[in-house]
Amino acid sequence: MKKKILFWVLGILGVLIIGGGIYAYNVYSSVSNTLKEVHQPLKRDQNNSNVGEKVSKSEPVSILLLGADERGEDKGRSDSLMVITLNPKNNSMKTVSIPRDTYTEIVGKGKSDKINHAYAFGGVDMSVATVENFLNVPINYYIEVNMEGFKDIVDAVGGVDVKNDLEFTQDGHHFAKGNIHLTGDQALAFTRMRKQDPRGDFGRQMRQRQVMQGVIKKGASFSSLTGYGDVLAAIQKNVKTNLTQDQMFDMQKNYKDCLKNSEDIQIPGDGHKAADGIWYYYVPDAAKQDLTNKLRTHLEVTK
């Protein structure tokens, strides 16, 4: 499935500015206040005045999209991890979905574990450091979305339309095959199912991208949204990023054509139970190195 995704999870954020054009400027004050509230620098960047230069100079950048799970036994873990690299020089984008059970070193913890546990151990700062170490590429920016509250964003845009390729029931909601409309609660259940899908986590990642696309499509019609206040409130409550408002504007201006040439990358590996009885996803060193080389080339990283 060819996907035009998560640059516009700035769609969850910036599409309110991006898609709305002149209309968005009529509510500039509300949008501006929201974007100031969602801004949360990484600890490593708080004394770094050069953190935003890559965007302003139209250099290749990377973004970690992190979906945080706030329910039950998964509370405090990252439910989804995607790395997006953007190169405005050749107008291209690559999106890497990282299986949440990937076994790797947790930077700052002194142990190896599932990559999604980094968030539980040390929040977004440890997640960024761990993903950087796993891929051996720099992560310039992050966008964190509270997946439990994501339903508020879906409802705020009036629900989303997706094409479902697998009939299943999850959390009391039945999803037929074909084109379906999802409310916020339904979208959350739709994106959480993986045990009934023979593709496992990869199938769930696909559904997450579909729902995100649906939000982006609705957000791009911002001028037709009468409840933009609800959208902004949902974003303010459920999204954090180290991107500033100016960087979002610059990204829209300088990077939007990257969507014209997008590539989605799945990480090859093997999942099985370890001696401790816990299921992990293992990525061969050779496969990881191939991925590292591809991303570093795309980001024009030479050191």
From Swiss-Prot:
<feature type="topological domain" description="Extracellular">
    <location>
        <begin position="26"/>
        <end position="303"/>
    </location>
</feature>
<keyword id="KW-1133">Transmembrane helix</keyword>
<feature type="topological domain" description="Cytoplasmic">
    <location>
        <begin position="1"/>
        <end position="4"/>
    </location>
</feature>
<dbReference type="InterPro" id="IPR050922">
    <property type="entry name" value="LytR/CpsA/Psr_CW_biosynth"/>
</dbReference>
<dbReference type="GO" id="GO:0005886">
    <property type="term" value="C:plasma membrane"/>
</dbReference>
<dbReference type="InterPro" id="IPR004474">
    <property type="entry name" value="LytR_CpsA_psr"/>
</dbReference>
<keyword id="KW-1003">Cell membrane</keyword>
<keyword id="KW-0961">Cell wall biogenesis/degradation</keyword>
<keyword id="KW-0735">Signal-anchor</keyword>
<dbReference type="GO" id="GO:0016780">
    <property type="term" value="F:phosphotransferase activity, for other substituted phosphate groups"/>
</dbReference>
<comment type="pathway">
    <text>Cell wall biogenesis.</text>
</comment>
<dbReference type="InterPro" id="IPR023734">
    <property type="entry name" value="TagU"/>
</dbReference>
<keyword id="KW-0808">Transferase</keyword>
<protein>
    <recommendedName>
        <fullName>Polyisoprenyl-teichoic acid--peptidoglycan teichoic acid transferase TagU</fullName>
        <ecNumber>2.7.8.-</ecNumber>
    </recommendedName>
</protein>
<comment type="similarity">
    <text>Belongs to the LytR/CpsA/Psr (LCP) family.</text>
</comment>
<dbReference type="Pfam" id="PF03816">
    <property type="entry name" value="LytR_cpsA_psr"/>
</dbReference>
<dbReference type="GO" id="GO:0070726">
    <property type="term" value="P:cell wall assembly"/>
</dbReference>
<feature type="transmembrane region" description="Helical; Signal-anchor for type II membrane protein">
    <location>
        <begin position="5"/>
        <end position="25"/>
    </location>
</feature>
<comment type="function">
    <text>May catalyze the final step in cell wall teichoic acid biosynthesis, the transfer of the anionic cell wall polymers (APs) from their lipid-linked precursor to the cell wall peptidoglycan (PG).</text>
</comment>
<keyword id="KW-0472">Membrane</keyword>
<keyword id="KW-0812">Transmembrane</keyword>
